Amino acid sequence: MALRTLASKNALSFALGGAARPSAASARGVTTVALPDLSYDFGALEPAISGEIMRLHHQKHHATYVGNYNKALEQLDAAVAKGDASAVVQLQGAIKFNGGGHVNHSIFWKNLKPISEGGGEPPHGKLGWAIDEDFGSFEALVKRMNAEGAALQGSGWVWLALDKEPKKLSVETTANQDPLVTKGASLVPLLGIDVWEHAYYLQYKNVRPDYLNNIWKVMNWKYAGEVYENVLA
């Protein structure tokens, strides 16, 4: 049981570089995750993001990643118990994809905030100063992230990252549901924008740039600033 439990607990860490936090455990000792609650109503981000999109995005898409990740963990636990190395290796793809989907979306929900609660207010303090230093201005950062997000082929994410080693900000993109840690172990996600079609198509159709322009109206820069300061503390 010790080997099975260790493998299950370390599965997401193996695939994602330790970017996830377990939130529940099954009777067999397999560490699983749960769909996080939102701190705002589905319609609270309108008109930037419709309530219909938010409901489907959270209740269907994110929930599916959670369910599939937990299922893959249970299968991994069984494979380790049997000593089935081929199955263990085969399951890593499902763990990375679905675990990454859970990690990325858990960050994404925190990156959003209703306008009535301060969403869209530009960053201040240390993060604001760092943005000016590393990108020239807040407007230049937005332009850069919009361009990177619009140019990303297929599905993926665009990130504002803090590289802990040089203590510099950077803009990164990841494909599919790859989490930011796959681009480098020292990269910390401060803000992520989902550019999968499920994040915008019902409202913006195939005009991804319009979605990117409007999402800044509900960005939670307070949260990003807190993460930035905590990492550098």
Curated annotation (Swiss-Prot):
Its main location: mitochondrion. Mn(2+) binds at residues 57, 105, 194, 198. Keywords: Manganese, Metal-binding, Mitochondrion, Oxidoreductase, Transit peptide. Pfam families: Sod_Fe_C, Sod_Fe_N. Its cofactor is Mn(2+). It is found in: Mitochondrion matrix. PANTHER family: SUPEROXIDE DISMUTASE 2, SUPEROXIDE DISMUTASE [MN], MITOCHONDRIAL. Destroys superoxide anion radicals which are normally produced within the cells and which are toxic to biological systems. Belongs to the iron/manganese superoxide dismutase family. This is Superoxide dismutase [Mn] 3.4, mitochondrial. The lineage of its organism: Eukaryota, Viridiplantae, Streptophyta, Embryophyta, Tracheophyta.
